[in-house]
Amino acid sequence: MTHITLGHTPDADDAFMFFALATGKVASRMFEIEHVIEDIETLNTRAINHELDITAISVHAYSYVKDYLILRSGASFGLNYGPRLYSKKPLQSQELSNSIIAIPGKLTSATLLLKLLIGNFHGREMNFSSIPKAISSNSVDAGLVIHEAQISESTQFHTVVDLGKWWHNVTGGMPVPLGINIASRRSLKIEEIRNFDILFRKSIEYGLKHMDEALEYSMKYARGSSKDLIRRFVKMYVNELTVDMGSQGERSIGHLLEKGREQNILSFDEILFSSP
């Protein structure tokens, strides 16, 4: 049995996907799994330092890692929706470059998308959970909101832009790639990576078939949100592309990173995917 360190976030959608694995509903006979639970920006940094065998990261952060394959399962794609830029008072697009904008991490895909849209801006990095309060208190002019706050805060603030909708429009309908899971080629054999990918897919499929059971488990990570809101959030980001991204997911990941390279925001050598 192979021991693996598995990084994922304390977020409801990740909890939903890993529910069957974490509770033994889907048995892992090949792997002894050590769960490492951190926020996404911490996982991004740990992946860059190559500290974990398998981990969730932002698509943006993939351009900074080495020797990791992208798993086909477990990715988060927005289907004409995504991270939202909120403000307390209406903001015009031309004002954004001179505004102070709270961001949930420099390596998050949300930050990359905003840079693609408006270019350089005055970003103030903070934990994603602190951003709504920073907007309310006027500590920042606007805030880039991810996770379930995209939904829960939608009536409290002005929506400057929904970056998933913007991406959908400018790409002719592509899903917006936000989070992926990657596996180390240094510490794991290719066959082990493929086997884990299959196992992860089974865990996601189990959750989708046993929605209420998996949601009940996910509520431990709901941060005070209602079950109805978490259900809605999970259904948004655990979709058919999460089960297997397919060629559509591969293309959208490649397109986002290529756009980042074209605008000199990032650079990368190659994008490596796990075999189907």
Where are the model-predicted features located?
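Bilobed "Venus flytrap"/periplasmic-binding protein-like clamshell domains
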Residues: T2-T23, P83-D141, E148, R251, ...
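A structural signal for short loop-to-beta-strand junctions that line the ligand-binding cleft
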Residues: I4-T5, D67-S76, I100
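Extracytoplasmic small-molecule ligand-binding "clamshell" domains
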Residues: D13-M17, V26-S58
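A local structural motif
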Residues: V26-V36, L117-S130, L266-I271
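Beta->alpha turn/N-cap motifs
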Residues: D39-E41, H50-S63, N127-F128, L144-I151
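Hydrophobic/proline-rich hinge and linker segments of small-molecule sensing/allosteric domains
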Residues: L71-S93, N169-R186
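Pocket-lining segment of extracytoplasmic ligand-binding domains
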Residues: S129-M219
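Secondary-structure end/capping motifs
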Residues: K189-K259
